[in-house]
From Swiss-Prot:
This is 4-diphosphocytidyl-2-C-methyl-D-erythritol kinase. It comes from Solibacter usitatus (strain Ellin6076). ATP binds at residues 96-106. It is an enzyme of class 2 (transferase). The keyword Zinc does not apply. Its EC number is 2.7.1.148.
Amino acid sequence: MSTTRHAHLRALAKINLDLRVLGKRPDGFHELRTIFQTISLADTLEISFTPARKTTIELTDVLNIADNLVVRAARMVMDAMRATGRIEMRLTKRIPMGAGLGGGSSDAAAVLLALPVLAGRVLPLPKLSHIGEQLGSDVPFFLLGGAATGIGRGSELFPLPDVPAQSGVVVAPGIHVNTAQAYRDLSRRLSGSLTTELQQNKIFSFQSLTWDTGRLAEARNDFEAVVFEQHPKLAAIKRRLVRAGASAAMMSGSGSALYGLFRDRNAIFRAIELLGEDTTYRISLVSRKRYRALWRRAMSEHTRSNVWPLQSRYNP
């Protein structure tokens, strides 16, 4: 008789502590330098796997999006493992969609990390990252967690030391930002083509910064220059965060969510009051150690070691 294996997962959101667009590459994509950071805001994903002769995938979620990223992730990881089985998933969204917080990418990464464990197979991190990159440029980051530098399209990753614990808020004003248009508007402002010399100068400037929460005032998000022109309300929200005492306030990704980090917890309540009716979430930064501890706790029934990615106790 086949045994069904279950897991209840939290798929954490991310913010960008810094985001620079260096220019447009010959392949048509933009060269990025960014600092990713996981935060406590999360979706929940219940997933079960039952060995079977053929693969079937069922997803229950209120959004009812055709070809949801988690379904694509499940299909791709099953193909990579050359495994078959019945997969049932229930996704509960809390991370605002299309806000620059990586919710869909994190959900997909959760499937990539969990399914090999439940299916009793091994997929090394480079293979998972390759699958993740095909799903979306942010997905590989959620296979690492904590803080990391992202280069290229953002999917080439270099883990950074964990930044000190800090609390804050994420504001989701519900404004739709056309990411493709934001890139086009930003491209028109970039000086010339991305020559090797220009790229190296911009990379040196980026790398010369010290990435800790004490120096975040030096950070920036290049998208703000064009997105704030189209959506002045977002600029007003950032000003309110600064007025409330945020040590760092910035748009995440291409928007429209913004975040503020605070050294004074009382300032968080001031910020929430100033933000009025806009949807606001209290958050904390999640270190890589804590991120992986959350995963180990969620998958403890099915794992047998502390290596990363998690290894299944059902491996042959």
